[in-house]
């Protein structure tokens, strides 16, 4: 029996409770920023738009005086609201939440739900919401869609163990990806060298 199995058996023997996501997390919808104030010269505040959600970084800035409530900090959990409902963590030290991107934040991280648990939980949840939308048009995530979402909320101890397991897996995956990328470059180098030698020998 794994540590997770033991925790589940001890802390939630009757199963995990599902709660409306708005009962455990606050959602902030992005500010309608003015495009005419955007720039790529790092002038002003970094701007988190839909295209930036997965990467968690941006090259677009705004000089607009956006209310402070829309300011972002490192690690904030973002969801894109058009097209693909991507989920990602903001990786810059500051930023501004732009319209059609929303931010999720635990109402009570100490006793109810961890932000790190939400980070792992939301991608499959949003994928299901996205797939439930009619195809053939650009899909839009609406506030009413979010209000219908229910999520499993195990005890904090169980959440911490789930996060630990998934974080370790993510780290291993990143290491394997880096290794595969390096091997691919190595293969391409030797392939090009060998093909170059073959071509020379034919002359």
Residue ranges, per PLM feature:
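Basic, amphipathic alpha-helical recognition segments used for DNA target recognition
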Residues: 20-28, 94, 102-152
């Amino acid at each position: 029996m794994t540590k997770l199995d033991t925790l589940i058996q001890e802390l939630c023997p009757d199963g995990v409770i599902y709660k409306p996501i708005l009962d455990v997390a606050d959602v902030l919808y992005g500010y309608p920023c003015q495009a005419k104030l955007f720039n790529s010269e790092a002038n002003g505040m970094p701007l988190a738009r839909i295209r930036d959600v997965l990467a968690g970084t941006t090259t677009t800035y705004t000089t607009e005086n956006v209310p402070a409530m829309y300011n972002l900090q490192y690690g904030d959990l973002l969801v894109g609201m058009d097209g693909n409902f991507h989920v990602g963590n903001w990786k810059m030290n500051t930023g501004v939440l732009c319209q059609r991107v929303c931010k999720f934040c635990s109402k009570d991280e100490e006793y109810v739900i961890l932000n790190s648990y939400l980070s792992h939980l939301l991608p499959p949840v949003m994928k299901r919401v996205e797939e439930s939308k009619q195809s053939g048009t650009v899909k839009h995530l609406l506030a009413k869609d979010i209000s219908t979402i229910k999520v499993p909320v195990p005890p904090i101890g169980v959440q911490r163990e789930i996060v630990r397991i998934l974080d370790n897996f993510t780290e291993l995956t990143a290491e394997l990806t880096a290794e595969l990328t390096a091997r691919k470059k190595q293969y391409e180098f030797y392939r090009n060298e060998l093909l170059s030698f073959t071509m020379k020998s034919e002359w």
